[in-house]
Amino acid sequence: MSEIASRVKAIIVDKLGVEESEVTNEASFTNDLGADSLDTVELIMEFEKEFGISIPDDQAEKIGTVGDAVSYIEEHAK
């Protein structure tokens, strides 16, 4: 697992209060991890802060799974 993936998963565990074992690349923030729309906005904001990136709203809407988040951040992180 990449450093970015590890950091993304740690943020999700912290923010959503889920078990690390639940946070798989295929896990949907809403369907599998119980996040609501506010939770997902907060996750995106935390990813932006942690990785020093900006995620436009139109891109944030496409980030629905843990794997989506990791892929986006790996592409855009400095």
From Swiss-Prot:
It holds the Pfam family PP-binding. It is found in: Cytoplasm. GO terms for cellular component: cytosol; membrane. The keyword Phosphoprotein applies. The modification O-(pantetheine 4'-phosphoryl)serine is found at residue 37. One of its GO terms (biological process) is lipid A biosynthetic process. Keywords: Cytoplasm, Fatty acid biosynthesis, Fatty acid metabolism, Lipid biosynthesis, Lipid metabolism, Phosphopantetheine, Phosphoprotein. Residues 2-77 form the Carrier domain. Pathway: Lipid metabolism; fatty acid biosynthesis. 4'-phosphopantetheine is transferred from CoA to a specific serine of apo-ACP by AcpS. This modification is essential for activity because fatty acids are bound in thioester linkage to the sulfhydryl of the prosthetic group. It comes from the Bacteria. PROSITE patterns: CARRIER, PHOSPHOPANTETHEINE. SUPFAM superfamilies: ACP-like. Its main location: cytoplasm. One of its GO terms (molecular function) is phosphopantetheine binding. HAMAP family: Acyl_carrier. Carrier of the growing fatty acid chain in fatty acid biosynthesis. Belongs to the acyl carrier protein (ACP) family. This is Acyl carrier protein.
